[in-house]
Amino acid sequence: LQTGYGPSGLPHIGTFGEVARTSMIVNALKHLTDLPTEIITFSDDMDGLRKVPDNVPQKELLEKNLHKPLTNVPDPFQKFNSFGEHNNEMLKKFLNNFKFKYNFKSSTSLYKSGFFNSSLQVILENYDGIMNIILPTLGKERQKTYSPFLPICPVTGHVLEIPVKNINKEKSIIVFDNNGKDLETSIYDGNCKLQWKVDWAMRWYALDVDFEMYGKDLIESAILSTKIIKLIGKTNPSGFAYELFLDEKGEKISKSKGNGITIDQWLEYASPESLSLYMYQNPKRAKKLYKEIVSKTVDDYLDLIEKAKNQNELQLLMNPVWHVHNSLVPKENMIMSFSMLLNLVETSNADSKELLWKFVKKYKKDISEKDNPIFDNLVGYAITVSYTHLRAHETYV
């Protein structure tokens, strides 16, 4: 099972959503079958940097390195060898914090190491057939310049989107026009990469991918990539198209814009499990993702834990928290809703967990922090939410 990540910007909550949802599918497969399963988290870090993201420092540094592979662009945060590596590490750090099990794959690494070489040769052998699939979907002007292969310019280091003038299948080379001068390059070892739709199909082919989910905006790409992988001799993976996350204004969440709530913000306000629940719910429905939605999701999570106590095995399998907790549903009794807890913070002016617990114990006797770990965490989150939102006159209902 594969998940994809385009590291042109910092990882956002939608990126996490793919891994979380795919992990839930893996968990279900393990209970249903004895098939070996693995999640591949693939980073398209050899893509050229098309534009400077809004939410990074040293924009002028990135401006000077536009069109280079992301792993050849300097890191504006000055922590890693490249911008691509920085964003890859941010993704891995987050996924590791959630204890996801995955196998990280770097496009740059697989191209440059030669891992993709044999698959690239298959693409070259089927060059004409692939062009016949792609060209009818393009405008007349784009048809004149399109090529499945994108050479890396030996002078500028840019990923070149230019037409290929000639191919040599026996020597595994392509010939292209570089500012009026014909240049030839091997398709092997990272000297070029593939255009997106062809690259996606080649990746499925090379990595033997059986399943991949993708955003609604990639449905047309998936259709073409499916035609390509069938052309080159393998079965396409099963797919699932999910609706996109929107910010408060109803705009698509973008890695480069950094709009909507961030991963770190959600985890500041609520538990990882509540975020996983949000990912589970209604994947075919476009959902706004902003700060006020957090408390509602937490309350949904608490309600589902309560319902699980009285459910039989079949009903439990249909309960989202079974998937959120990889079948190990917690048994804790819920003391009050998160919304009620937030209101208690506001009315009591509690400024610490200890003080808020005192008010909670007035509401419900004979309870302790030790016996209620989920609620104890909620008390801490409530204090955080209070000082970042309630004090700013934002209302939770």
Language-model features: where?
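N-terminal catalytic cores of NTP/NDP-binding nucleotidyl/phosphoryl-transfer enzymes
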Residues: 1-57, 199-221
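Conserved, well-structured beta-alpha core segment at the onset of a catalytic domain
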Residues: 5-31, 35, 81-105, 248-253, ...
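Conserved adenylation A10 loop of the ANL superfamily
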Residues: 12, 157-159, 271, 388
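Charged, often glycine-rich, active-site loop that binds/positions anionic groups
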Residues: 47-62, 119-120, 124, 252
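A glycine-rich helix N-cap at a beta->alpha junction
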Residues: 62-80, 94
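Active-site cores that bind ATP or allylic diphosphates and position pyrophosphate for catalysis
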Residues: 96, 100-263
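Catalytic adenosine-cofactor/nucleotide-binding cores of aminoacyl-tRNA synthetases and other
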Residues: 217, 243-385
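Single conserved hydrophobic/aromatic residue that forms the stacking wall/gate
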Residues: 389-397
